[in-house]
Amino acid sequence: MSESENNTTPAVAARDDRLVWVDLEMTGLDLKRHVIVEVAALVTDANLNVLGEGVDLVVHATEEELAQMDDFVTNMHESSGLTEQIRESAVTLKEAEDAVLALIEKHCDPAHPAPLAGNSIATDRAFIREHMPRLDEALHYRMVDVSSVKELARRWYPRVYYKQPEKGLAHRALADIVESIRELDYYRRSFFVAEPGPTSEQCADDAQAAVDRFAPYFD
């Protein structure tokens, strides 16, 4: 995927405001028993422009590791073609981790670690922490979870929620990332305050209103 440069794309934002989008496919959800079998990553700037080429790697797993998949995961990975690619792959998890770290080094400021971004990323972060600790250390402890925005849209602006772009449900890592970036772009257009945003005075008024509303809980 090449860097987006057209008249409809916001200017590329500062290097210290990058987001690292990672999606994993695993053999299951048990950190100790299951393994990572696909790693995809893209870096965007603050305006959600995709920067350069990303990472999209299938990681080899042994037959014993594949046997740990339950029926649901087995069917999902077989239907997507991932299982066959896992068996054919010679890529190790360390090599996949190295590739993501190289992507981060190329596009992000090491003095300002970028947050991990994605959809429902708590499980991905847990597997990163357990199985790719160097990558975990390279990321900011904060995360940008698009599913949090989705849940707020459902409660505050149901029309926004129900009109979100449809997902392909490919259950492949790179496709999932692109869909997550696209979804956040949609929410930014439909849900958030349009640029240039509120004035400083409006922000101050809103902050005071929030303080006043919840002041009784601090008495």
UniProtKB/Swiss-Prot annotation:
Pfam families: RNase_T (PF00929). GO terms for cellular component: cytoplasm. It is an enzyme of class 3 (hydrolase). Residues 19-184 form the Exonuclease domain. It is found in: Cytoplasm. Keywords: Cytoplasm, Exonuclease, Hydrolase, Nuclease. GO terms for molecular function: 3'-5'-RNA exonuclease activity; nucleic acid binding. Its EC number is 3.1.15.-. Belongs to the oligoribonuclease family. This is Oligoribonuclease. It comes from Corynebacterium glutamicum (strain ATCC 13032 / DSM 20300 / JCM 1318 / BCRC 11384 / CCUG 27702 / LMG 3730 / NBRC 12168 / NCIMB 10025 / NRRL B-2784 / 534). The lineage of its organism: Bacteria, Bacillati, Actinomycetota, Actinomycetes, Mycobacteriales. The gene is orn.
